[in-house]
Structures are given as C-alpha cells and as structure tokens.
Swiss-Prot record:
Subcellular localization(s) per the UniProt record: Cytoplasm
Keyword Cytoplasm in record: yes
Name of the protein in its database record: Co-chaperonin GroES
Oligomeric and partner information: Heptamer of 7 subunits arranged in a ring. Interacts with the chaperonin GroEL.
Role this protein plays: Together with the chaperonin GroEL, plays an essential role in assisting protein folding. The GroEL-GroES system forms a nano-cage that allows encapsulation of the non-native substrate proteins and provides a physical environment optimized to promote and accelerate protein folding. GroES binds to the apical surface of the GroEL ring, thereby capping the opening of the GroEL channel.
InterPro entries reported for this sequence: Chaperonin_GroES (IPR020818), Chaperonin_GroES_sf (IPR037124), Chaprnonin_Cpn10_CS (IPR018369), GroES-like_sf (IPR011032)
Species, as recorded: Streptococcus mitis
Keywords associated with the record: Chaperone, Cytoplasm
Gene Ontology terms: cellular component: cytoplasm
CDD domains xrefs: cpn10 (cd00320)
GO biological process: chaperone cofactor-dependent protein refolding
Cysteine-cysteine disulfides: none
Amino acid sequence: MLKPLGDRVVLKVEEKEQTVGGFVLAGSAQEKTKTAQVVATGQGVRTLNGDLVAPSVKAGDRVLVEAHAGLDVKDGDEKYIIVGEANILAIIEK
C-alpha cells in the first residue's frame, strides 16, 4: 500500500460519467476535472512555528480534482494518482 508524505494524497480515479450532487457535469467541466476517492493521505505539513496542519481530506472521501494534476502510479495491478492537497478542488458530500 502506498503511504504518501507531507500534504500529498493518493487517489483512485473513478472512470465514469461525472456527477456532483446528482448533476451531470458538462463535457467541458469533465475535461478539466475528475472524480476520485481518497485512498491515503500524508501526515500534513508543518507551519513555520512547527505546528502540524493535517490534511482536509481523509481516506474514503470522494473528491473533485484537477484533470491533469498529479502523478500516475501503480501498486500491483491497481492504478492511482498522487496529488498535492492543493490540487483537490472540493469534497463531494453525499
């Protein structure tokens, strides 16, 4: 299993028509974003005074992410992307 460092997040991209809250995203929006599930998160980042700021997302969250963000990786037969938390645009609430 992949364990990201810092503010990085491991995502499993959903390969289907994208909807947000039951609304189908327009074709142009689908080209700019993709829906993914958070698989793992790093521990967060440290502020200048040394405090740890935890990620805003957690494993199991569904998120909307920039389409071309991140690095494609494989772990066994599974494909994932690793992105910085800043590339996550929104958490999709049920």
